[in-house]
Amino acid sequence: MNGGGRRRYSSEQLMFDVPANAGGGAGKWGQRGGVRRGDGEIFVSVEPTTPARLRGGEAAAAAAGESPGQRQQLSPGLLDLHAFDTELISDFQVPGIGMYDGAQKFGYGNGGFDDSDPTFAPNKQMSKSTVFAESNFLKAFPEKEKAAPVAKIKVVVRKRPLNKKEISKKEEDIIDIEQQSNSLTVHETKLKVDLTEYVEKHEFVFDAVLDEDVSNDEVYRETVEPVVPAIFNRTKATCFAYGQTGSGKTYTMRPLPLKASQDILRLMHHTYRNQGYQLFVSFFEIYGGKLFDLLNERSKLCMREDGKQKVCIVGLQEYRVSDVETIKELIEKGNATRSTGTTGANEESSRSHAILQLAIKKRVDGNDSKPPRLAGKLSFIDLAGSERGADTTDNDKQTRIEGAEINKSLLALKECIRALDNDQTHIPFRGSKLTEVLRDSFIGDSRTVMISCISPSSGSCEHTLNTLRYADRVKSLSKGSNTKKDLSLAAAPLRESSPSLLASAVPSFSSAEVMNDITERSNFGWTKQQYVKEHQAPTFVDRMQKVKEDTEFSLSNGGYFKEQRTKGSVPVGIAEVPDTVYQQGRQPTRKARDLTSDNNMRNSIAYPIIRRVVPDEDEHLNELLQEEEDLVSAHRKQVEETLDMIKEEMNLLVEADQPGNQLDDYITRLSGILSQKAAGIVDLQARLAQFQRRLNENNVLLYAQCP
C-alpha cells in the first residue's frame, strides 16, 4: 500500500485513485461497488440486494450518462459475481426501506448505516437512480448466475483491555490494531539460540478489527445489525463468540440478543405490520455433552434429526414475546441458571456453551389454530473458553473433565470448518452436540458472524495466536469455487504463517487465468494459506500439517505443536517445509541444527503416538459419561420400582388388618416383596461399585472434603 491516497486491490475489487487533496472520504473504497467518472467523482452503491460492481465498459457508459440496464449486449467479464464483497447483508429489499434508511429508524446512534461502517465516508452520497439502474442491470443475468455461492461468514476480532491481574503481573500489551485497514499485529517475544530476546511479528487481516475502546453498541452495529432484516426471508443467522477463557466472550455476547430483539420487534410492528409474524425465545446450554433448558429449571433435552436432516431440540420450551422487557427477564433468568465455575485462568468461567435463539414464525393463512411456521431464526452462541491443562492445574478433577469436554467440542467444530474449507463430501457435524447445533450456521441459506475475543497480555500470546489462526481459517471458508484440487498441481507458492497486508497487494486474475495462478484467493480477496508440495515433501508436509491442526486443542495437558517460523522468513521462490517441533509442557529453547539433523528430527516425531493418545482419551471420556448415564437411569428405575412396591405393601397391610385375612398369603406376598427389593438394591450397589472402580482407574474420583 503506497501513500498519497493510492490503494491497489485485486482485479475483482474496485480500484481507483483519489487525489491527495480530496476532502472527506479520500482514500476510501466502496465495498458494494462503484463507478468512477472521468472527473474523478466516485459513486458508491450500497444497495442491499445485490452488491453489483461495475468495471470497464460500465464505467465508461456511466460516465456518458447511459444506464447499465439499457445495454442490450453484455460482453463476457463485465460482472464477476464471484468477486462480490461478502459482508453480511440481507438478500432481499425490505418493503418501504431503501438504501438502508431503515437503519436510521432503529439504530442506536444518531447516524445511519454509513456511520457504523468505517469504510463509508459520510460525505459519499448516491442517487437512487444509480441503485435502480444496477438492479435492472442484474436482472439481465440468468437466475443461476445471480445465485452464485459466496462466502457467508463474517469474522470480527475484538481486543479487550488489560485486567487488574495482568497489570499486577506487569504484563505488556502486545497487540497493535489498525482499524482503517482492519488489520492487527501480534508482537511475540522469543529467544534466540544465544538466549537473547527478539520480537517476532504476526500480521492478520479480518473483516473488522475492534480495539479495547469500542463499546458494545458499536460491536452490535458492526456484527449483528446488518443481518437482522435477513431473518424475515427464511434465513438462519448465527452469531457466536470464540476465544480463550477470560477473553471477554460473555461480556461481548450478553447485550447483543437484547439489542437484536429490539430491532426485530420494531420491524415486526412497522415494516411487517399485519403480516402475522411472531417472535419466540428459547435458551439452552450444552454442558458435558448434554443439553439443558435454561428457561425450564434446567430440564434435560434431547437432540434429534428429522427426515430432512434438520436438527430438532426435543422438549425445548419456547416463549412467545411481544416486548423487550419480557425478553430481558428471560435472558437474565437463563444467564443466572447457566453453569459457571472458577478456574486458574478465570474466576467466573463459563463451563458450558449457551445458545439463545430468537425464532420468527408466521401464522399459516392467518389461522391461529394451526401452529405457526418458521420464517427465520437468529441464534447467539456463547462458546465456553478454550483452555489447556497447564492453565487449570489448581483445580479438581471435575473441572478438568469439563475442560476436556469443552476442548473436544471445539476440536470437532474445527474439524467441520476444515472439512468445509477443503470441500470434502462428508462434514463431521455429528462429532459433538455443539457442531450438530451449528449445522444450520454453515450450510443452506445461512449468515454467520464470528466474534473472536482475544487477550492483549504477553502471558496470553500463545492463546491469542491460536484464536487468530482459528478465526483466519473460518474467514477463508468459502464455497464459491472448487479450484483447490487444480491449484495443488500448480507451482509452489511462498509459505506464510498468517495473512498480511502485503498479500492484499498481489493482484488476482480472471476465471480463465486462475488455473495458472500460484495463489488461491477467497471471496474476501486475501491470499489463503497453502503449503509447499514439491519433490519428496508432499507426504511429510501434509502429515505434519494435519498433526498440528489435530493437536492444537488436544485433550492432553502437555504436548502441543507450535510454529517456529513466520511469514517473510523465506525469500521469494524458495520452497520451505513447515517447521514444527513436538514439545512437552513449556517451550524449551531450540538449539541450532543443520538441515540434515533437522529433517531427521522431523521424521522421528511421534506422529502415531499423538494420533493414538487423543482418541483413547476421547474414548475413555465417552465411556465414563455413558456409564454415568446408565447408573443414573438404573437408580431412577430402582426408585420407581421401590415406590410401586411401597404401594403394594400398603395394600398388603390394609388387607392384613381386615378380619379373616389369610396369614399364609400375607407371608408369601411380603417375602416376595422383600426379596425383590433386596435384589434391586444389590444390583444397584454392583453398578455403583463398578462405576467407582472405573473412576479410580482413570483418577477422576471426587472425594467429599471433610469440614
UniProtKB/Swiss-Prot annotation:
User: Which Cys-Cys disulfides exist here?
Assistant: none
Q: Which GO terms describe its molecular function?
A: ATP binding; microtubule binding; microtubule motor activity
Per the UniProt record, one Pfam family is Kinesin
Q: Is Nucleotidyltransferase found in the keyword set?
A: no
Can you give the residue ranges of the Kinesin motor domain? 152-477
* InterPro entries from the UniProt entry: Kinesin-like_fam, Kinesin_motor_CS, Kinesin_motor_dom, Kinesin_motor_dom_sf, P-loop_NTPase
Identify its protein family. Answer: Belongs to the TRAFAC class myosin-kinesin ATPase superfamily. Kinesin family. KIN-13 subfamily.
Name used for this protein in its record: Kinesin-like protein KIN-13B
